[in-house]
């Protein structure tokens, strides 16, 4: 009795993939602090294998082994052990496709919490932990939280650009050739005085 429904689900999946094939997922990479502040959960974890696909919901889930939670203690409550990361099946719908086969490699994962489950996408800030600078690793563990809800990293997308508020910090990595993500790797936008935020060196904290 389940075969017709499975075939129908597969047909729907194929149809949606054809419709969405011309609409590639597109998102600008955020500053790490923005990714931290805008996420419900930030964890360090290892991916434990290939995803399990649910053809009915068009979502797949990756089994993960969390090694440390950096943000989200209050959000998850008693469910402090996150075992799965959910994402759309199709990359055209911003589904995340994990490429690494190394199950011992630790990743920084930022995501949203929906119905008690961790959801990630191709737009999530999700990188191998080892690729972060030591300053960024410290910031994800401690520093970035001080700017959440108070300060805003304001991206400069074209020159000239200007700040819209004293609580904004102008992020210029994307327009300065040769910057090598210098601001992203070494600075955080943090409060200096009430109503004023400035770039602060992560190495100085």
From Swiss-Prot:
- Record PTM: The activity of TIMP1 is dependent on the presence of disulfide bonds.
* Subcellular location as annotated: Secreted
GO cellular component: a single term: extracellular space
Cysteines paired by S-S bonds: 25-94, 27-123, 37-148, 151-197, 156-161, 169-189
Residue numbers bearing the Phosphoserine modification: 179
Task: Give the sugar-modified residues.
Answer: 54, 102
Q: Which Pfam family, giving just one, matches this sequence? A: TIMP
Q: Write out the ranges of the annotated region (Involved in metalloproteinase-binding).
A: 25-28, 91-92
Per UniProt, residues of the NTR domain are 25-148
Q: Which GO terms describe its molecular function?
A: cytokine activity; growth factor activity; metalloendopeptidase inhibitor activity; protease binding; zinc ion binding
Q: Site: Involved in metalloproteinase-binding. Where? A: 38
Q: Does the keyword Secreted apply?
A: yes
Q: Where is the signal peptide?
A: 1-24
Q: A biological process (GO) annotation for this entry?
A: response to cytokine
| Known tissue expression | Found in fetal and adult tissues. Highest levels are found in bone. Also found in lung, ovary and uterus.
Write out the residues that bind Zn(2+).
25
Q: Which domain of life is it from?
A: Eukaryota
UniProt similarity note: Belongs to the protease inhibitor I35 (TIMP) family.
Assembly and interaction partners: Interacts with MMP1, MMP3, MMP10 and MMP13, but has only very low affinity for MMP14. Interacts with CD63; identified in a complex with CD63 and ITGB1.
Give the protein name, as stated in the record. Metalloproteinase inhibitor 1
> In which organism is this protein found?
Mus musculus
Provide the taxonomic classification.
Eukaryota, Metazoa, Chordata, Craniata, Vertebrata
């Amino acid at each position: 009795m389940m075969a017709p429904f499975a075939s129908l689900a597969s047909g729907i999946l194929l149809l949606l993939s054809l419709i969405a094939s011309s609409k590639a997922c597109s998102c600008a990479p955020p500053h790490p602090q923005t990714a931290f502040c805008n996420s419900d959960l930030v964890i360090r974890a290892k991916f434990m294998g290939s995803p399990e696909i649910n053809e009915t919901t068009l979502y797949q889930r990756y089994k993960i082994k969390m090694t440390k939670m950096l943000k989200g203690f209050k959000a998850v409550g008693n469910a402090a052990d996150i075992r799965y990361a959910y994402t759309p099946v199709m990359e055209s719908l911003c589904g995340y496709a994990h490429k690494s086969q190394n199950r011992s490699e630790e990743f920084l994962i930022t995501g949203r919490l929906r119905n008690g489950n961790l959801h990630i996408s191709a737009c999530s800030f999700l990188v191998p932990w080892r690729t972060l600078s030591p300053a960024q690793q410290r910031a994800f563990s401690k520093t970035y939280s001080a700017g959440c809800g108070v300060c805003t990293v304001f991206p400069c997308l074209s020159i000239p650009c200007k700040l819209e508020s004293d609580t904004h910090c102008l992020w210029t990595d994307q327009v300065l050739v040769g910057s090598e993500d210098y601001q992203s790797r070494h600075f955080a936008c943090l409060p200096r005085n009430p109503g004023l935020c400035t770039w602060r060196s992560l190495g100085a904290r």
